[in-house]
Design a protein with these regions (language model features):
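Small-residue-rich hydrophobic transmembrane alpha-helices
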Residues: 51-111, 148-167, 273-337, 368-390
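N-terminal transmembrane alpha-helices
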Residues: 8-40, 44-45, 59-74, 78, ...
Length: 450
């Protein structure tokens, strides 16, 4: 592997991590932007029921997307390991096996979302006026799930190769297509939530075609043969990394779906306000998410190269970068949350409800700078079972019980429900700091024994 921008085993940690993270962040910003455009256009040109439908439906789609992304993290880490170990010839089998596994996964998700869209919408306690529109949104997105899964897998492959710029291009094109689709189908033809769903699927399809074309043209340090496209031994390796992350992410997103259901019981206005707040939250979480994804690739290369000391230094660098931006976002959300909510809806009551939720959620923007940097380190170190375990504790023992108790209070408010996220993340930070110190002491004992 050449000593270029994709080699993380030497040079300034801050510079290398930042240069890799910026395109990742850019891609996440654009991805959140085209998700926000759906809500923005439906909020301006559709109905209140349509706004609620996109809010609830996108929560369901987010669950699927985030689980697929975490499963694909196993592919990213394994590719980075092989590059760090100077064994790129193994990567062809990784890519071929991943293509087969994720195709099988897509078929299962397709059947679930298309065949059970309405029961899922009812289970989510979508307001009665919005059940039909929510089911339509979920069904259409489910029909295009092959493109959504393929996009996330291809982006994971490029990041594993140390290329975070190409995924930025993919999502930029997708964003442009989605905006055009929303304006034509929702604003122009009045298709409401269904139009937003069609635009989303079309955008992902175009980005997948572009990604495949670039991968074919890219000068790769390995060969891919037809024989690689099977359930080969590499599948077990990347699944052993990705499955714990996917399960943890599934339960985390399930907890947010449950939270959405708790909010939906408070009425249509609260549901729409929460949907608006969720889009703002998606933007607020972009920097921690970019750090976690970048950290996993950065750490995996250094672990593959046998440089654990450099991998550890990158954690502190990541936390420092995250805290600077996290504090700025916290101040923005607390001081101007109502202005941000007003971007997505002209309804004063919806804006007020959205701001209520943001007030409770705001501390999360600081805490995740620490948590996500550490999780990226553990992911790159193949400590994904721990990542899963701490995630289960946060989700099942803290976030869900806290949100449920807050939602059934006589004076229930979105601010109190919003506190569930930072409270559970604080517990996660304490758990991960403890585990990091435990591993550090264990490593030092082994070194002294040697």
């Amino acid at each position: 592997m050449s000593t270029d921008h994709s080699d993380f085993t030497q040079g300034s940690i801050l510079k290398k991590l930042s240069l890799f993270m910026l395109p990742v962040l850019g891609a996440l910003i654009l991805q959140a932007a085209y998700g926000a455009v759906d809500l923005l256009v439906v909020g301006r040109f559709g109905s209140t029921a349509g706004l609620s439908a996109v809010s609830t439906g996108s929560q369901i789609l987010n669950l699927v997307t985030f689980v697929v992304t975490q499963l694909a993290m196993g592919v990213t880490v394994l590719i980075a390991w092989y590059l760090g170990e100077k064994r790129p010839e193994q990567i062809g089998a990784v890519l071929g096996g991943a293509a087969v596994v994720f195709t099988i996964l897509s078929v299962g998700i397709f059947i679930l979302l298309v065949g059970f869209a309405r029961p899922i919408s009812v289970l989510m306690q979508a307001p009665e006026e919005a059940v039909g529109l929510t089911a339509s949104y979920v069904r259409i997105c489910g029909g295009g799930i092959f493109f959504i899964v393929a996009y996330n897998l291809l982006s994971a492959i490029f990041r594993g190769l140390g290329d975070s710029r190409s995924p930025l291009l993919f999502v930029l094109v997708a964003c442009i297509v989605n905006i055009a689709g929303d304006l034509i189908l929702v604003a122009g033809f009045g298709m409401d939530a269904a139009g937003a769903a069609i635009a989303t699927v079309l955008a992902q399809a175009v980005s997948v075609v572009l990604a495949v074309a670039l991968l074919i043209r890219k000068k790769l340090p390995f060969a891919i043969t037809r024989a690689d496209f099977r359930l080969n031994p590499q599948c077990r390796k990347f699944l052993s990394i990705g499955l714990p992350l996917a399960l943890q992410e599934f339960l985390t997103q399930l907890s947010f779906l449950a939270l959405c259901a708790f909010v939906n019981r408070l009425g249509l206005t609260a549901s729409s306000g929460y949907g608006v707040a969720s889009k703002i939250v998606n933007f607020a979480m972009l920097i921690p998410s970019a750090l976690m994804q970048s950290m996993a690739s950065f750490v995996a290369q250094n672990v593959g190269a046998g440089d654990q000391k450099r991998a550890k230094k990158s954690v502190l660098t990541g936390i420092g970068v995250g805290l600077v931006f996290g504090c700025a976002v916290f101040a923005l959300v607390m001081l101007k949350g109502d202005v941000l909510a007003g971007i997505f809806s002209p309804d004063a009551e919806v804006v007020q409800k959205g701001f209520e939720y943001l007030k409770g959620f705001a501390p999360e923007t600081i805490l995740t700078a620490i948590l996500f940097s550490m999780l990226g380190y553990f992911n790159g170190n193949n400590k994904t079972l721990w990542v899963m375990a701490q995630g289960l504790i946060q989700t099942l023992l803290v976030r869900l019980p806290f949100a449920y108790v807050m939602s059934i209070q006589p004076n229930a408010s979105l601010t109190k429900i919003g506190l569930a996220a930072p409270v559970s993340t604080l517990v996660g930070v304490l758990l991960n700091v403890g585990f990091y110190l435990y591993l550090d002491r264990k490593e030092k004992r082994v070194q002294r024994a040697d």
